UniProtKB/Swiss-Prot annotation:
Key words, A-Z: Glycoprotein, Host cytoplasm, Host nucleus, Late protein, Transcription, Transcription regulation, Virion, Virion tegument
Pfam families linked: Herpes_UL47
Subunit structure: Interacts with US3 kinase. Interacts with UL31 and UL34; these interactions seem important for efficient virion nuclear egress. Interacts with UL41/VHS.
Superkingdom of source: Viruses
Sequence similarity: Belongs to the alphaherpesvirinae HHV-1 UL47 family.
Name assigned to this protein: Tegument protein UL47 homolog
GO BP, one annotated term: regulation of DNA-templated transcription
Biased composition (Acidic residues): 110-134, 177-204
Signal peptide, first to last residue: none
Post-translational modification: Phosphorylated by US3. This phosphorylation is required for proper nuclear localization.
Organism annotation: Equine herpesvirus 4 (strain 1942)
Length: 872
């Protein structure tokens, strides 16, 4: 009978039908049309482990390979009718009974490394200033030609929606945007695959990646191995994933990038400012400024103590043997021309010739060859920096090792300022995987022995960011002017909320002609630029690039990169998907760091805005540039900003923040990271002011690029920190109070910095963490570690760097941070920009209800998402 009817007794043999998209992209989550480096890989817990990747509504596992698997094996009896007949008429011996599996929640992770050997080791009254309460040119400008005649007509929404300053509807307008073209049709995909299979040419971009043909074959082998329950399916799946990632991660042939600004950004740039709008400024800003410090004598009377610098930074500077710029850099201009490096960056192609550009920004020295000895010395300087946890940190690893595989336990320890050593070393490997290895693998595969492409990207993206600052500052001015308008003439609500407190201030048109634009610039869209802006700002880890900027920029970039890496290691060592929450003290410190870090990023971007205009100007000694030319502000206030000075006093003098700073290891790491950035940026800006008047133009250019490298890493760190906090609020149900203007400010700055950094959404971030943990063979586990893995690293005393960093008092009243609001509720207005536009509508309701906000607010948040207006 078997011979006549086949092994299934006549039952039809048919595989479940899958779409062309699913067959071509098995590691892409359903519904995702764009595969980024952080999107999930085919339900990593199920499909990639060989189990069924979906469940029936009743809770039974759906065996999608029943027809093929059971037909080839007699050891797994079928429960179908044909299977019953087959067992009745078959002479085969019945299958041996199998012992029931232990429950997953009580079973230890498979192949968990024992760390019993770890037990043997030891855990090591003032006059108020109005300098920044108003715009830089207060009382010296007026809004001209701002009539609303000739405005474009917008569709009036037919539904009611909130219009409060918190709503931030423009962040959700993507739901009403024009639908993206659907994925390729089946015939188109077949034609594409046929073409690829016949394509045997070498990849022209010298990426040395395997062609798509190998990926197609590997996917088919993986499908066959999973269908037959082959024992080598896990190895085939892992190799297929590696091939897939090489194609569809940033830099891969299949990685697609958006070529034009999103419709949300288009709406944002048009809401509140029109083609006929312009800013007319009056005053003496076009006069030569012989003494920029003369405008800041009132600061000397108001602030009695200079800005405090990190003691560890001062020690680093004092121990450094070469803190000055080396004028005898050896490079051949003819060789650079032959290598096509001495050319104008793409942002100014057609506007400035190469000779004119490099006269204004003399940066050709950054293309000089960095020897292997110099690069090794720079990497060793990073590794030799003393970390809070006492272990060595790497900036350019060849591979990730020296961690325990198996369970990862992130629960709080009994000791104050303590952390599990097992989790810490696992977090060090995970941080390298998330933030560093993507760049190192790209550089290795492309055989980029030099840093030239990174320098070109850095200067190009930095100038594009300055152009976005030009646009954003004007949008905010007109948002303030039209804040009382209604209907389609009303600007976006986040712009209105920020317009009265922003530090992005407009420059006179006469000194910023090269920065003028009317739409947001999203930057270059090449494979290399995709890598350089991904992975939370990875360029600071590249030793050759840091060394190319020369001191004093190089040493400050290294100092910032190291301490922000430490902060992220502690963040990863304290939470994962099985335990996404933090302690109350840790959340207080995280909120304070996020609020101050976002404000500091805004101050730094305004500095980039003014410095870019100054470097590109034919006369860099004008009064319009006094904010970057004067040295007094940077000697008295952090980053030369009274607003940041007052915000630090307001936040850091809070008793809850002071307790959190001293009582938890994570809080100390976060604040040390913040003050490291604040110290390094202040030092670079101060050195820039000292050099710009008659000093070395090469040093000025190096400091400008160094500030850009630091703020890329700072913005990536803020993205990292925000996703950890948002996960604790929405996934962990923690009730977190956050300043109401932090998220609007963060979202606007993320749009401004789009040429430099690719923002990662909450959903993508947590999926990427789980994916990377699986690749590292680490399993998130709730609770404390088991016996033999309970070694604690504890800092005996609070860090000496932190107590003296808080300013002694405020200069003005109020720092423009907003009132305290619930984070879980506030996040619902930022579905596209923060949570992720591919998130389900239920994301966050669990956090709202667990944090005590209630069902009513959860339903209101869902209503706001559903009825976001198209016009904003």
């Amino acid at each position: 009978m078997d011979q006549h009817h086949g092994v299934r007794g006549g039952a039809p043999i048919r595989r479940p039908r899958r779409s062309i998209e699913t067959r071509s992209h098995p590691f892409r989550a359903a519904g995702n049309t764009q595969r980024t480096y952080s999107t999930p890989r085919l339900s990593y817990r199920d499909g990639l482990s060989g189990r069924a990747s979906s469940l029936e509504p009743g809770g039974q596992a759906h065996d999608q390979n029943e027809s093929s698997t059971q037909s080839t094996s007699n050891n797994q009896p079928s429960t179908s009718f044909w299977g019953y007949l087959r067992r009745v008429f078959s002479d085969d011996a019945p299958a041996q009974p199998q012992a029931p599996r232990s429950r997953a929640d009580f079973a230890p992770p498979p192949e968990e490394d024992s760390s019993s050997e770890e037990e043997d080791e030891e855990g090591p009254s003032q006059a108020p200033l109005d300098e920044e309460d108003q715009l830089m040119y207060a009382d010296q400008y007026s809004v001209g030609n701002s009539s609303d005649d000739n405005e474009e007509d917008y569709l009036q929404p037919e539904v009611e929606y909130p219009t409060s300053a918190e709503s931030g509807e423009y962040h959700n307008s993507g739901m009403f945007a024009e639908e993206e073209p659907e994925s390729e049709s089946e015939s188109d995909m077949e034609n594409y695959e046929t073409y690829e299979e016949n394509d045997t040419e070498v990849i022209s971009d010298d990426s040395h990646r395997l062609t798509r043909t190998w990926l197609d074959r590997s996917i088919r082998l993986m499908d066959d191995a999973l269908a037959q329950s082959s024992e080598i399916s896990k190895a085939i799946t892992k190799s297929t994933r590696r091939l897939y990632d090489s194609q569809f991660t940033p830099g891969g042939r299949g990685y697609k990038q958006t070529e034009t600004p999103s419709q949300r950004l288009v709406h944002l740039s048009r809401a509140g400012m029109y083609d006929s709008d312009e800013i007319v400024m009056t005053g003496d800003y076009m006069e030569v400024d012989d003494d920029p410090n003369s405008a800041y004598q009132s600061w000397v009377r108001a602030i009695h103590h200079p800005v405090a610098m990190n003691p560890s930074w001062e020690e680093t500077i004092s121990n450094h043997t070469n803190t000055s710029f080396s004028a005898d850099i050896d490079y051949d201009i003819d060789e650079l021309i032959e290598m096509n490096l001495a050319r104008t960056p793409p942002v100014f192609e057609g506007l400035l010739d190469s000779a004119d550009f490099f006269y204004r920004l003399p940066m050709l020295y950054t293309y000089a060859t960095i020897t292997q000895d110099e690069a090794y010395e720079e990497r060793q300087a990073w590794s030799n920096t003393q970390a809070l946890h006492g272990h060595e940190q790497s900036s350019w690893p060849a591979l990730v090792s020296d961690y325990s595989k198996g369970g990862m336990y992130v629960s709080p320890t009994q000791e104050p300022r303590g952390i599990w050593r097992r989790a810490l070393k696992q977090a060090m490997a995970l941080q390298l995987k998330l933030c560093v290895l993507g760049l190192t693998e790209f550089v290795t595969k492309r055989e980029l022995t030099q840093h030239h492409s990174a320098v070109t990207f850095l200067v190009d993206s930095l100038l594009r960011t300055a152009k976005n600052c030009y646009l954003a500052s004007r949008l905010l001015v007109f948002a303030w002017e039209r804040r009382r308008e209604t209907g389609v003439r009303r600007p976006a609500e986040p712009l209105i909320a920020l317009s009265g407190v922003t530090l992005l201030q407009p420059l006179p048109p006469e000194v910023s002609e090269l920065l003028e634009q009317r739409t947001f610039d999203i930057g270059l869209r090449t494979p290399q630029s995709g890598v350089f802006r991904a992975f939370f700002g990875p360029l600071v880890y590249w030793a050759e690039l840091r060394r190319a900027l020369r001191d004093p920029a190089a040493i400050n970039c290294r100092y910032v990169g190291f301490h922000l890496q430490t902060s992220e290691i502690y963040l990863l060592a304290r939470a994962h998907s099985a335990s996404p929450g933090y302690t109350k003290e840790e959340l207080v410190a995280m909120e304070a760091t996020l609020t101050l870090g976002t404000l500091m990023l805004e101050v730094a971007l305004q500095w980039i805005h003014v410095a870019s205009a100054q470097l590109l100007s034919e006369n860099d000694a004008l009064k319009a540039f006094r904010r970057v030319s004067a040295s007094i502000p940077h000697a008295l206030a952090p980053l030369g900003s009274i607003r940041l000075h007052d915000a630090e006093f307001e936040v850091l003098s809070n008793p809850d923040v002071m307790v959190a700073r001293d009582e938890t290891a994570l809080s100390q790491a976060l604040f040390l990271g913040y003050f490291s950035v604040r110290t390094a940026l202040t030092a670079c800006m101060r050195d820039y002011a000292n050099e710009v008047d008659g000093g070395s133009k090469e040093t000025v250019t190096g400091l400008f690029l160094g500030v850009g490298l630091i703020i890329q890493r700072l913005a990536g760190h803020m993205n990292f920190l925000l996703n950890c906090m948002a996960g604790a609020a929405l996934y962990g149900g923690s009730k977190i109070a956050i300043h109401s203007l932090t998220l609007p400010r963060y979202s606007l700055l993320a749009d401004v910095m789009a040429p430099m950094l690719q923002q990662q959404s909450l959903v993508d971030f947590w999926r990427a963490r789980d994916d990377m943990l699986e690749e590292l063979e680490i399993t998130p586990r709730p609770g404390p570690p088991t016996q033999g893995k309970r070694v604690v690293l504890e800092m005996p005393l609070p860090s000496d760097d932190l107590p003296a960093m808080t300013p002694s008092g405020q200069v003005n009243n109020g720092a423009g941070l907003g009132r305290m609001v619930d984070m879980a509720k506030h996040l619902q207005h930022y579905r596209e920009t923060i949570i992720g536009d591919d998130a389900s509508s239920s994301v966050g309701k669990r956090g709202l209800m667990k944090s005590g906000v209630g069902v009513r607010h959860a339903l209101e948040a869902e209503k706001v998402i559903r009825y976001s207006p198209k016009s904003t």
